[in-house]
Amino acid sequence: ARFVVAKANGASILLAPGCCQSVAKRAVTFKGTYGEGEAARTQPLTFSFDRPLNKKPFQILAHRGGGRTSDLLPASENSVEIIQLAERLGATGVEIDIRQTKDGTFIIYHDINLNLRLTQKTGLVGAIESYTYDQLSVFVRLFNGEKIPTLIESLDVILNQTALETVWLDSKDVRDMPRLRTIQQTYLQRAAQQGHRLNIYIGLPAQEQVTQFEQLPNHRQLPSICELDTSVAKRINATVWAPRWTLGQQIPSTVAMQQQGRKVFVWTLDVPEFIQQFIQNGSFDGILSNYVPSVAYYHYVQK
């Protein structure tokens, strides 16, 4: 598709100093044409300005760095390349899966094992923690040819090449929680120095990770996301409570958490009808999804 805004259809408004503070309804019109598939662009299409987008603060969180490999995106899940695409898909933040290699390097990878679902065929088999990072870097490529990234590489890209606001570090297999905390604090400090508004949360999906987290000094002051029940979120002073969407909207619990100063993100919500319902409810602070364009659409058009 291709669209043009003529001077008479609002181009002068868009180019004026101080544009867009108070644009009248239908004062700006995009006119153009589109085609189906490889066909020529011959079908007319017009978009006219109706009202401003919803400005309510809300986190649109991309699962696995931007989306799943199985959804045939142009980059593999949990890759640096998909993180770089996340904003174009509508995300304001990303969730990435944290594991450690045999030599302790933090990497981004979802599954326990190397497999053909996530990687190209290789001679390596079995648990990813059985290999050093150098071995994985040399011999393994993700489904679309990318390297398995380290956590450091991923955070460098997020901080220096995107405007993403939220990073959810989903602790799939973390044997060194103190070092993960150090990395979190280092990048929070760098973001503050660069003027990049960025929240980095240590995700706690199960009791094992909560136990590790509680052993950290001053853990109650660390930014964290708790997927367990509200009593655990309160005990560890989690910054965010994150229930799964299949438990329902849980409005009383959500309101109680927010009254305690916590945010509430729901996961992993992919069905458009339910995305619309959860956004129209208006209680949540963010949604984690494999389909962030749908979340972005329903959020921004919400009145």
PLM-predicted stretches and their roles:
Residues 1-303:
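Phosphate-group recognition and catalysis centered on beta-loop-alpha active-site segments
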